Each structure stands twice: as C-alpha cells, then as structure tokens.
C-alpha cells in the first residue's frame, strides 16, 4: 500500500515508477523538478517488482531496491514510496498499477512520470492507450534521446518537463561499485 498522507483532500500526484537499481541523485532531481513544474502535492515512487523489459539477473532483489528507495526519499516530505508492485505477484504492468491506485484513491489526480527513452517505445507498452486515457504522461529528457512523441495518438496527453539533463545511470553506478 502507499505510504502517503491519509486525508480527505484531493491531491495531485505524480507516479514515478522504475527499477531504482539503485535510486540516485538524478531520480531525486527529476522528481523534484516535476513536482515543482506541475504543482504536484506528492510524487509516489513505485519500485518495479518484475519489470517486463529488464533481465532479472541485472536487478538487485526487490526488497533491497524497495529499502534503497525508501532511504533515498526519506528526507523529502513530498516524496512517498508505494510498494503496490512489490506486493502484487507477477510482471509489473503500469496500466494495472494505475487502475489499482485510481480505485484505491478516487479523489486523487495522477500523472505518470517517464523518461524520454521510455516515451520512444511507449506505444509498445502493455495497453498504452488505456494508460494515456487514464493519466497525463509527464516526460523528462534523458541524455541522448530526442524529445518528441513517436506516436501522434499520444501527443495531446504528453507534457514535457524542463529539467536538467543528468548524465547519471543506475548501470553506471553499479559498474563503478564493482
């Protein structure tokens, strides 16, 4: 369940999913810039239990990634960790997460935060049209990726963020730690 404030007030929340293998400074900066530019009350970080696009052997254990993510956001009052994908068995599909969160939090307006690298293949995601119908898509630029909507059918649901481009990746961090 989401470790978020429990009030009767409507909220605007950004859903920031990822493997967070590990969470790093670029994730924190992006989440903060998105929260600020879009006037979000909170950003919910959602570590993927079993992402459909990554090999299991490249990932730290899900409980370890969840713990790292909690530590990373601990000092940020507008950031929360949502373990919905960790609690749900099987592959983590964004559309299922969005459906469940909208059902659990009907007064909350959600937006999906993704990198421009993910936007490039968003049309290949599981049920992308339903995702785009349910939530706006907030896109931050990733290094080396062109900032444009590959599929015009999603263009009116995509909003780009003016965020600093960070040359940091979990892959690079893991390689330096070996």
Ranges and model annotations:
Residues 1-178:
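Nucleotidyltransferase catalytic core that binds NTPs
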């Amino acid at each position: 369940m989401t470790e978020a404030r429990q009030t009767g007030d409507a909220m605007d929340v950004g859903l920031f999913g990822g493997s967070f293998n590990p969470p790093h400074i670029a994730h924190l900066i992006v989440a903060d810039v998105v929260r600020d530019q879009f006037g979000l009350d909170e950003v919910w970080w959602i570590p993927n239990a079993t992402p459909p696009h990554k090999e299991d052997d490249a990932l730290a254990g899900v409980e370890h990634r969840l713990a790292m993510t909690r530590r990373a956001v601990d000092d940020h009052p507008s950031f929360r960790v949502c373990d919905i994908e960790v609690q749900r068995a099987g592959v983590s599909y964004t559309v299922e997460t969005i459906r469940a969160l909208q059902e659990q939090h009907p007064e909350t307006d959600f937006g999906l935060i993704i990198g421009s690298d993910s936007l490039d293949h968003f049309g290949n995601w599981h049920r992308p049209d339903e995702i785009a119908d349910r939530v706006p898509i907030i896109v931050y630029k990733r290094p080396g990726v062109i900032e444009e909507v590959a599929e015009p059918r999603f263009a009116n649901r995509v909003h780009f963020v003016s965020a600093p481009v960070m040359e940091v990746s979990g892959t690079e961090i893991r390689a330096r730690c070996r």
